[in-house]
Amino acid sequence: MECALDAQSLISISLRKIHSSRTQRGGIKLHKNLLVSYVLRNARQLYLSERYAELYRRQQQQQQQQQQPPHHQHQHLAYAAPGMPASAADFGPLQLGGGGDAEAREPVARHQLHQLHQLHQLHLQQQLHQHQHPAPRGCTAAAPVAVAGAPAGCAGALSELPGCAALQPPHGAPHRGQHLEPLQPGPAPLPPPAPAALCPRDPRVPAACSAPSAPPGAAPPTVAASSPPASPAPSSSPGFYRGAYPAPSDFGVHCSSQTTVLDLDTHVVTTVENGYLHQDCCASAHCPCCGQGAPGPGLASAAGCKRKYYPGQEEEDDEEEDAGDLGAEPPGGTPFAPCKRARFEDFCPDSSPDASNISNLISIFGSGFSGLVSRQPDSSEQPPPLNGQLCAKQALASLGAWTRAIVAF
């Protein structure tokens, strides 16, 4: 999708800018706020463009539908002759003689109609001799029947009508002592067999019809037995993240040589070499790094190390750098951060970024871009922020785990 490509390119550019400005004072926070505001603006433009494009398409379709009815009004007069009235096209060819009164007043018309019936019977007999299957002949043989008493120019136009309409007797026109013989089109065609009779013999559907239909009450237990039991997934409910993180902006800005990133959607831990990302792992009970951190004081201080994120936090971070490391690296394994205040040594600002870790971050952030677009109308209703910090806080309050992961920079 274009959205996924745009999200990946946007995240890759932002990661490069943030990584190149990690040595500047306040550079990471600046580019983080720029990233959030830029993403929100682009998502809003994308949402509005798609919405207006859909509205424009609907309006064009409505205009086309309003212009089409005048062309369809004259279609029902296709079989009517030029000299016939418009209402004549709505009747069959044998119903245009004026009913029984017209036949009684015009003996010549009745005689012509009788001759037409005789010709029709002769034609049917010839077709029965020629073809042994008389099923489709009952309707096609009546096509050349013309209307008695109608103008001569109408016969050619009325012959185009379906033949089945010619077999209909005139309504309210009983035969009054005429020598008209009853119309016998031959043996009636066999009705089509019922679908239930062909269903057991049809090889295409052997199981759907041969087996007796189960009652409606028995279907839900079968479906319930085949489907696995639904386990309460805490990651699917937004209340899980609210309980795990008291405030939406509880992530601090840390510069370290090795950093661990936890994806809030999939709970996947990604380690960034020479990076800039750090996210709290101890607040969630389902995080795998809680059991691998330093025992004793490290785990005990995990609950008490939470604090609000405000603009002056970086200065406090600089003052508290001498307090010591609260986390310990497990021997022979990937380093995990048991607390948000954990520090790592050997920070090298001149090293190049790891391409594989950046691609992992791009895949993590690209997966949540659809959620950002879907919830964009809620964030567009808010007033414009005064600065970048308020923009980040409003984005965290209005959006979900995707921007929380962005604020981890």
Curated annotation (Swiss-Prot):
Domain of life: Eukaryota
Region (Disordered): 168-237, 312-335
Compositional bias of kind Low complexity: 196-212, 220-237
Ranges of Pro residues composition bias in the record: 184-195
Chain segments annotated as transmembrane: none
Coiled coil location: none
Bias (Acidic residues): 313-324
InterPro entries recorded: IER
Entry's family note: Belongs to the IER family.
Protein name: Immediate early response gene 5-like protein
Organism whose genome encodes this protein: Rattus norvegicus (Rat)
Gene from which this protein is expressed: Ier5l
